């Protein structure tokens, strides 16, 4: 994927960078209860949607249950309103 344009559907994110981890940490900080916890990214994807939508599936390193969580980050950096420029969600993920 690196260097090639991304179009249309959902594509795996092959190499997580600092910006991706910043999105994850920001989502964890918004929860209040998970701020600062160490996590492991199980898989991630990205999609062009009037900006970029990133989806990360994580587990917490200190959680023996293996519960997965889904974080989404919708980045539209050209918007002036910071609340609209980055939308974050954090949810429990129940694999099907």
From Swiss-Prot:
Superkingdom per UniProt: Eukaryota
Tissues with expression: Salivary gland. Midgut.
Gene3D superfamilies: 3.10.450.10
Residue positions with a glycan: 29
Keywords tagged on the record: Glycoprotein, Protease inhibitor, Thiol protease inhibitor
GO-annotated molecular function: cysteine-type endopeptidase inhibitor activity
Glycoprotein listed as a keyword: yes
InterPro entries: Cystatin_dom, Cystatin_sf
Entry keyword annotation includes Glycoprotein: yes
Signal peptide: none
UniProt induction comment: Up-regulated following apoptosis induction by staurosporine. (Microbial infection) Induced in salivary glands following dengue virus type 2 infection.
Cystatin domain mapped to chain residues: 22-65
Listed CDD domains: CY
Gene ablation phenotype (knockout): (Microbial infection) RNAi-mediated knockdown results in increased titers of dengue virus type 2 in salivary glands but not in carcasses.
Complexes and interactors: Interacts with cathepsin L-like peptidase; the interaction results in inhibition of cathepsin L-like peptidase activity.
Function (record text): Cysteine proteinase inhibitor. Inhibits cathepsin L-like peptidase. Increases cell viability following apoptosis induction by staurosporine. Inhibits human cathepsin S (CTSS), human cathepsin L2 (CTSV), human cathepsin L (CTSL), human cathepsin B (CTSB) and papain. (Microbial infection) Modulates dengue virus type 2 replication in salivary glands.
Family the UniProt entry places it in: Belongs to the cystatin family.
Other remarks on this protein: Negative correlation between cystatin transcription and titers of dengue virus type 2 is observed in infected mosquitoes.
UniProt-recorded name of the protein: Cystatin
Organism name: Aedes aegypti
């Amino acid at each position: 994927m690196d260097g090639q344009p991304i179009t249309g559907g959902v594509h795996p994110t092959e190499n997580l960078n600092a910006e991706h981890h910043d999105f994850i940490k920001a989502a964890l900080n918004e929860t209040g209860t998970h701020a600062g916890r160490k996590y492991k990214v199980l898989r991630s994807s990205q999609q062009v949607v009037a900006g970029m939508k990133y989806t990360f599936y994580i587990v917490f390193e200190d959680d023996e249950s293996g519960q997965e969580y889904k974080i989404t980050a919708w980045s539209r950096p050209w918007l002036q309103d910071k609340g609209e420029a980055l939308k974050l969600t954090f949810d429990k993920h129940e694999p099907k």
